């Protein structure tokens, strides 16, 4: 399996064609010890999280007061969401367990950030958009464009009031959460079916031993 940011409906990844095992001549052809992973930058979940970070950094510094601890908290949560997806993708080469753990940390960090944005609106008696409102549906359509970059949303950051920007961030976080949830389900399934590095090492050794005996 390889993650691909262009295929969100399939859980942020696409299935690649496998080699015909009957034509293999070495254990490495049957199973790679370190399976390939796609570039984390192609992950749609990472792209969304990076946009959320860029929006949050600007939002917090522009609309929250100096000395407000929420500034650092929101920026750190946004950064954690982005960085843990990145680090999880890199860790995938050697440890599915670590990849799964870091991806879960990313999910939890974005959930904290989501709560901070909702707190901002609630404390000021400002509405959170209904998920089926025309505004939310517009952001959802914008969220289907690939790649997802801050430039898609820059105009809103420059021209819209803070309550609109906060709601856009909420929409994007919810989209990122959905993608990460699909990613986690895939990782859990992959771990159950294939195990981690230790299991792969065992299978490769057995395949090599069987080949020498045949």
Where are the predicted features?
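Amphipathic alpha-helical assembly/interaction segments
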Residues: 1-214
């Amino acid at each position: 399996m390889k993650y691909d940011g262009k295929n969100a409906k399939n859980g942020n990844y696409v299935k690649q064609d496998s080699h015909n095992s009957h034509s293999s001549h070495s254990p490495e052809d049957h199973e790679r010890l370190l399976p390939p992973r796609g570039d984390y930058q192609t992950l749609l979940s990472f792209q969304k999280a990076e946009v959320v970070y860029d929006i949050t950094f600007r939002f917090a510094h522009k609309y929250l007061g100096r000395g407000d601890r929420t500034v650092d908290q929101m920026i750190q949560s946004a950064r954690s969401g982005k960085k843990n997806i990145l680090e999880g993708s890199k860790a995938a080469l050697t440890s599915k367990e670590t990849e799964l753990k870091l991806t879960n940390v990313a999910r939890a960090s974005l959930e904290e950030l989501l709560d901070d944005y909702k707190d901002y609106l609630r404390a000021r008696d400002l509405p959170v958009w209904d998920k089926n409102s025309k505004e939310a549906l517009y952001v959802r359509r914008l969220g289907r464009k690939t790649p997802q970059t801050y430039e898609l949303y820059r105009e809103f950051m420059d021209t819209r009031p803070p309550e609109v920007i906060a709601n856009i961030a909420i929409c994007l976080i919810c989209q990122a959460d959905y993608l990460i949830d699909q990613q986690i389900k895939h990782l859990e399934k992959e771990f159950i079916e294939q195990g981690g590095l230790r299991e792969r090492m065992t299978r490769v050794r057995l395949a090599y031993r069987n080949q020498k005996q045949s």
